[in-house]
Amino acid sequence: MRKIGIIGGTFDPPHYGHLLIANEVYHALNLEEVWFLPNQIPPHKQGRNITSVESRLQMLELATEAEEHFSICLEELSRKGPSYTYDTMLQLTKKYPDVQFHFIIGGDMVEYLPKWYNIEALLDLVTFVGVARPGYKLRTPYPITTVEIPEFAVSSSLLRERYKEKKTCKYLLPEKVQVYIERNGLYES
């Protein structure tokens, strides 16, 4: 059975924290690949102004292009409305019955697991992999695999704020993503 990691998110913008998490889990669990799963509309972010799907996808392609073990999965972008992990993973497990999926989540999402849509059924479809993030403990009543990673306190919301404040984001996200953001005037106030 193939072992594939999945890291979901808005990737608004993608940054070195996403890449670090994906790479550390890839090596720690001896995965074949890690698929980045950009969300259409994450249920926990409804109502927030999110950058266009086209721009987020382009930035994600630029961020992941150098790693042959990283791929982009468009499953959630093909649907309209909120993206529920259960619905997506049900589709993916039917499409790829020979794959054992490892769904990678940060410490903030580990604590939020009890609120996930159809969590009990989702546990039959994936193995959750929790990675530590500063300020969060990996506490949950659900079974998760834990992977220790070096702390790198960067987030997409921090980067959007830094761009609005016209602060440098160098060394926080891939240079090609930074160039794309600046050329397209993303995250300006």
UniProtKB/Swiss-Prot annotation:
UniProt lists the family membership as follows: Belongs to the NadD family.
Organism classification? Bacteria, Bacillati, Bacillota, Bacilli, Bacillales
What pathway is this protein a component of? Cofactor biosynthesis; NAD(+) biosynthesis; deamido-NAD(+) from nicotinate D-ribonucleotide: step 1/1
Q: Give GO BP annotations, semicolon-separated.
A: NAD biosynthetic process
Quote the catalytic activity from the record.
Answer: nicotinate beta-D-ribonucleotide + ATP + H(+) = deamido-NAD(+) + diphosphate
**What is the species of this protein?**
Bacillus anthracis (strain CDC 684 / NRRL 3495)
Sorted keywords for this record are: ATP-binding, NAD, Nucleotide-binding, Nucleotidyltransferase, Pyridine nucleotide biosynthesis, Transferase
EC number(s) from the headed UniProt entry: 2.7.7.18
Which Pfam families does this UniProt record tie to the protein? CTP_transf_like
Name of the protein in question: Probable nicotinate-nucleotide adenylyltransferase
Q: Write down the SUPFAM superfamilies for this protein, in alphabetical order.
A: Nucleotidylyl transferase
Which CDD domains does its entry note? Answer: NMNAT (cd02165)
The enzyme class is transferase
